[in-house]
Swiss-Prot record:
Residues 57-93 are annotated as: Disordered. Belongs to the PPR family. P subfamily. PROSITE patterns: PPR. Keywords: Repeat. Pfam families: PPR, PPR_1, PPR_2, PPR_3. PPR repeats lie at residues 172-206, 207-241, 242-277, 278-312, 313-347, 348-382, 383-417, 418-452, 453-487, 488-522, 523-557, 558-592, 593-627, 628-662, 663-697, 698-732, 733-767, 768-802. SUPFAM superfamilies: HCP-like. Coiled coil: none annotated. Transmembrane segments: none annotated. This is Pentatricopeptide repeat-containing protein At5g02860. InterPro entries: Pentatricopeptide_rpt, TPR-like_helical_dom_sf.
Length: 819
């Protein structure tokens, strides 16, 4: 795809950055933190703090013997719920009486592991001339140790066995498979792979069970690409997969977000090998549809499953319901719930959580809360996923007080936060520019005995990226790799988005190329990420090419695809194309989902199209969707720019009634509105208000207040705000300086204006064309063209690094604009 975009790619090189730290100016306290208020009135303090909830949790975990650090992951093992022996007592089937006696002694707490070698020598001495009996005894013995969770002893027993003379003649694949499985459960997947490769190099013939065990071990530890590589090697070696192998690799494909056509091709190959899908296969295929929001494909598999003679179970219904939820179709998800109940299946916590997530994802938080209450009334207690989903939903909608209230309810219910909860708080603080608080939450993860997961790192990358902090993005990425995480598709997508938000589009495309080189296949989320990057640059023609590529069959577009196209048209000033796409949404050619209507409000506001913005806002509400904080901010912004104070206040009242917490964008829009009015002093009042709430103003906030005072010739007040801005750690930009220069020039204070130019150059800020235009135009407005020309002639003395031809441009401006 990068080739089709015809975009210049940088050579792979990571931008230089200091070793990543939370804050170079002060040390971050490791005292657990979740008490800072985000709004007014402040939410109740969150005491006890997160680590107190984890007081009895053991943070110690076994580390794998591998070059790659593993992460503990809570994953359902393939086939675990269908194990016919689940819950049954251990049977000594296949184990000799002496073996049973040895096993009983080994599982005793006081067994001296130093005696293991001699005990094993005595046990296997009678079998030394009977290879088949040795193998059977070893298999039963290892299974017994595994049943009693004595994995370490089992692995040591196997190591002892491998040191025996002619061990290969006594070893069979059943033993290899069970050892690989044990190593996988112990997090020692690399050791399992090394053993597997060593046996192959020694000439041992590995069968399908050994291959499948290694594939499962990689899959269960989240090392999906390595699982696929083992599957490919298995086929290359002429080893035929079984149904279980296919089911495991289909599950891996789903986790990787493999394109649907590749998944269906594998199923067809399975059938051509004479292997018929079972119920687990169909359930896995439905689950595979989640990543691409493939609700139609999931419904088709659902019908095929029935036609094949299989009965639906709770897993089937939950999987289909989840696909509808992730496809932004909560109504269809609710229909699945009703059908599930009619067929005699009681909704589980998984069912309710999927539905709550579906409603929260679409901003339908009242419905999500109603479901939570409904599940509690029916005896299903909300768990950490329920609360964290609601917390994230309220945060995303801009309702921070409601989010904190949910966290309080979670604590009071005795529900321990998990890593997802921490990730939600990291995102909440990061989205509001509270980076110190965000990093305290990050520190608290380890204090509470947890470890950051891939989502934690991706969230940090996204937060720093959307704030244009490219050196921090590079620093986090380095720390992430140092922690042992291998970038997967979501990380690459996040990096593409982060660098494009920082204005480093070439670097974003370099990341995309690296992703392809790493063997990661683009999916819907990747295409949408690239489209979003193109949209930021207004590159609408290339966006249309990407859309055409998707529609050609590689990947079915969704509502986020069209959202990016709207942004591309808006940023590229293609208002006609934007209107045409909007009409397709309103007419139903493209389904008018909530996120599309919200995007229409945003792009129309950005393009200052008031009637169109109001239409999109009305359509959103009339179709039963709830506006979020971004949508409401867009309406405040467009009303503020047009000095429609009553309308802007009406939106603010709506926000207050519905429990929305004003964001920095809200405050900046209000400051902008007042900065252009007779009541310009109100801009600083709002600045003081947000400071009092513990929110750090950004450069836009300070520039707006400076403009308010400069516009009204209150230069001392403007200078006071400038000093305050610098003291807060925010570096003035060219807009800041140009505001002063323009104001001084308009008041004939040219000496002061030129003094500001010297000051900005001295402090590392380069003047732009607007800087010098203001001074030249100021002279010309007063009919002082000669002085304007003298200023231009002396420009090189003032700014030795001014662009070549800048003086000629300014002289031409004097002639053409001021004849």
């Amino acid at each position: 795809m990068a080739d089709k975009l015809a975009l210049p790619l940088l050579l792979p090189c990571t931008p230089s950055s200091k070793p990543y730290s939370h804050d170079q100016n002060h040390h971050i306290s490791r005292t657990p933190f979740l008490t800072t208020s985000l709004s007014s009135p402040p939410p109740p303090p969150v005491e006890p703090l997160l680590h107190d909830v984890f007081l009895h949790q053991n943070p110690n975990s076994r580390q794998p013997i591998s070059s790659q650090t593993s992460r503990n992951r809570n994953r359902t093992r393939i086939g675990k719920s269908r194990d016919p022996n689940l819950g049954k007592p251990w049977s000594y089937h296949g184990l000799s009486p002496q073996g049973q006696q040895v096993l009983r002694s080994l599982i005793e707490p006081n067994f001296d592991s130093g005696q293991l070698d001699s005990v094993l020598s005595e046990l296997f001495e009678p079998f030394k001339d009977k290879p088949e009996s040795t193998s059977s005894e070893l298999l039963a013995f290892l299974k017994g140790l595994g049943f009693h969770k004595k994995f370490d002893l089992a692995l040591r027993a196997f190591d002892w066995f491998m040191k025996q003379k002619d061990y290969q003649s006594m070893l069979d694949n059943s033993v290899v498979a069970i050892i690989i499985s044990m190593l996988g459960k112990e997090g020692r997947v690399s050791s399992a792979a090394n053993m597997f490769n060593g046996l192959q190099e020694d000439g041992f013939s590995l069968d399908v069970y050994s291959y499948t065990s290694l594939i499962s071990a990689f899959a269960n530890s989240g090392r999906y690409r390595e699982a696929v590589n083992v599957f490919k090697k298995m086929e290359e070696d002429g080893c035929k997969p079984t149904l279980i192998t296919y089911n495991v690799i289909l599950n891996v494909f789903g986790k990787m977000g493999t394109p649907w056509n590749k998944i269906t091709s594998l199923v067809e190959k399975m059938k051509s090998d004479g292997i018929a899908p079972d119920a687990y296969t169909y359930n896995t295929l439905i689950t595979c549809c989640k990543r691409g929001s493939l609700h139609q494909e999931a419904a088709q598999v659902f019908e095929e499953m029935k036609a094949a003679g299989f009965s639906y179970d709770k897993v089937t219904y939950n999987a289909l319901l989840d696909v509808y939820g992730k496809s932004h179709r909560p109504k269809e998800a609710m229909k699945v719930l009703n059908e599930m109940v009619l067929n005699g299946f009681s909704p589980s916590i998984v069912t309710y959580n999927s539905l709550i997530s579906a409603y929260a994802r679409d901003g339908m938080l009242d419905e999500a809360m109603e479901l939570k209450n409904q599940m509690a009334e029916k005896g299903t207690k909300p768990d950490v996923f329920t609360y964290t989903t609601l917390l994230s939903g309220f945060e995303r909608a801009g309702k921070v007080e409601s989010a904190m209230s949910i966290f309080e309810e979670m604590r009071n219910a005795g529900c321990k936060p998990n890593i997802c909860t921490f990730n939600a708080f990291i995102k909440m603080y990061g989205n509001r520019g509270k980076f110190t608080e965000m990093m305290k939450i990050f520190d608290e993860i380890n204090v509470c005995g947890l470890s950051p997961d891939i989502v934690t790192w991706n969230t940090l990358l996204a937060v720093f990226g959307q704030n244009g902090m490219d050196s921090e993005v590079s620093g986090v990425f380095k720390e992430m790799k140092r922690a042992g995480f291998v970038p997967e598709r979501e990380t690459f997508n996040t990096l593409i988005s982060a660098y494009s938000r920082c204005g480093s589009f070439e670097q974003a495309m370099t990341v995309y190329r690296r992703m392809l080189d790493a063997g990661v296949t683009p999916d819907l989320s990747t295409y949408n990420t690239v489209l979003a990057a193109l949209a930021r640059g207004g590159m609408w023609e290339q966006s249309e090419k990407v859309l055409a590529e998707m529609e050609d069959g590689r990947c079915k577009p969704n509502e986020l695809t069209y959202c990016s196209l709207l942004h591309a048209y808006a940023n590229g000033k293609e208002i006609g194309l934007m209107h045409s796409l909007a009409e397709e949404v309103y007419s139903g050619v493209i389904e008018p989902r909530a996120v599309l209507l919200k995007t229409l409000v945003l792009v129309c506001s950005k393009c200052d199209l008031l009637p169109e913005a109001e239409r999109a806002f009305s359509e959103l509400k009339e179709r039963g969707f709830s506006p979020d904080i971004t949508t409401l901010n867009s309406m405040v912004s467009i009303y503020g720019r047009r000095q429609m104070v009553a309308k802007a206040n009406g939106v603010l009242d709506y926000m207050k009634e519905r429990g929305f917490t004003p964001s920095m964008a809200t405050y900046n829009s209000l400051m902008y509105m007042h900065s252009r009015s007779a009541d310009f002093g109100k801009s600083e009042e709002i600045l003081r208000e947000i400071l009092a709430k513990g929110i750090k103003p950004d450069i836009i906030s300070y520039n707006t207040v400076i403009y308010a005072y400069c516009r009204n010739t209150r230069m001392r007040d403007a200078s006071r705000i400038f000093s305050e801005m610098r003291n807060s750690g925010i570096v003035p930009d060219v807009i800041t300086y140009n505001t002063f220069i323009g104001s001084y020039a308009a008041d004939s204070m040219f000496e002061e204006a030129i003094g500001v130019v010297r000051y900005m150059i001295k402090h590392g800020c380069r003047p732009n064309q607007n800087t010098y235009n203001s001074i030249v135009d100021g002279y010309c407005k007063l009919n002082r063209k000669d002085e304007a020309k003298l200023f231009v002639e002396d420009l090189r003395n003032l700014d030795p690094h001014a662009p070549k031809g800048e003086d000629l441009r300014l002289l031409e401006r004097i002639v053409k604009k001021w004849p």
